[in-house]
A protein has these predicted regions:
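Membrane-embedded catalytic cores of phosphoryl/pyrophosphoryl-handling enzymes
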Residues: 14-17, 29-138
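Polybasic, low-complexity association/targeting segments
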Residues: 1-6
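N-terminal signal-anchor/start-transfer transmembrane helix
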Residues: 8-24
Length: 138
């Protein structure tokens, strides 16, 4: 196996994380350490799976079965990011409201999941990373 297939998701994650932090910090006009994690622009998960699908397309071709698997996985990840995790965030908000000011309750994170724009940003970033990594590891 070529090492590039293991390096791609790691490099993509390491590049997209700081980009997301800087974008969120600029939006908040302060260092946004509280926004590190799930959610935000661009979507790390979408970028990682898209970078792998892009790399597979560039190296093995879009007709290769691995590309089909990568695209399927990407759709599952993106659907999860957009719908399921947003529902989890709404449930967390409801639980936080019910708990009120109970000191025994540790507030749950309410910002979960991604908007379609955040997912699209992850897709664009992932495609760019796939092309960049392919060029660097030829």
């Amino acid at each position: 196996m070529e090492l590039v297939y293991l390096v791609t998701p790691l490099l993509t994650w390491l590049v997209v994380g700081p980009i997301k932090f800087l974008i969120n910090s600029a939006r908040q006009r302060r260092w946004a350490f509280n926004l590190v994690g799930n959610g935000g622009f661009p979507s790390n998960h979408s970028a990682v799976v898209t970078s792998m699908a892009t790399l597979i397309a560039l190296r093995a071709g879009m007709g290769h079965p691995a590309f089909g698997v990568a695209v399927t996985l990407a759709f599952i990840v993106m659907i999860d990011a957009n719908s399921l995790r947003q529902h989890v965030g709404r449930q967390a908000a409801a639980i936080n409201r019910l708990a009120g000011d109970d000191p025994a309750h540790k507030r749950l994170r309410e910002r979960m999941g991604h908007t379609l724009v955040e997912i699209a940003g992850g897709i664009c970033t992932g495609i760019a990373m796939g092309f960049l990594i392919n060029a660097l590891f030829k």
